[in-house]
Amino acid sequence: MIFAAGLGTRLKPLTDTLPKALVPVSGKPLMELTLEKLRKSGFDEAVVNVHHFADKIEEWLAGQEWISLQPGDGEGRMLVQVSDERDLLLETGGAVLHARKYLEGCGHFLIHNVDILSNCDLDWLMAQVRPDALATLLVSDRKSSRYLLFEPDTMRLVGWMNEKTGELRLAGPHVREEECLKLAFSGIHIMSDQVLDVMESYAKTRGLYITSDTPRFPVMDFYLSMCHLYNIYGVCSDDLRLVDVGKLDTLGIAEEFLKTL
């Protein structure tokens, strides 16, 4: 699943007229770069959530000969199905539940932010998933203002911290921040489809449904709230290089980065 519904406010004025997913880097939209990466790793199906300029994303998808928008429509093409959030942006956790009909029954599915470019070998990442993992998060030891905290022996998620504000969230009183590994999240993660039932229960018990069938919540809040009950692991890639194409001044950096892949 590709998270592509964001407003892209940090990329204004480009996103005044087009969605972040269609912002070009080296002549290709971010959406195309992400889908190409998935396809090269053997993924033949994807789900894309849309909100900001949703019509433009759908028009772009429909115009790609190598993409099919309906199951069974074109052998050898990549099936890309759209999860529609036009009415309301559901945040990342709500987006996953909203796309449930496309995701359940698949065993595991990968989540990839559309604005992340990386050298991550997705085949390698999928091979790191443990049988008992509800989710597996790609992380690395790099400078960031926000860190996920992991048990050093198990790499199980046990907390989060914001170094700028001093905010700290721990899985319980047994967790000691100073004993944890502090690693930065990459915006790429893998979920077991069992997460869908857990997410639904989480959203209902916390009153996160804004209508009878529409939940809205961030996926990281879900991870941090449930990591004391479920195995949510980090996978650290020592040679991971990535660019978050979230601001105008990162576009040039992203173009240079693509030349190194």
Regions found by a protein language model. Name each.
Residues A21, L79-Q81, N231-Y233:
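Conserved beta-strand segments of alpha/beta enzyme cores
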Residues D132-D141, R146:
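A short, conserved acidic/glycine-rich loop-to-beta-strand motif
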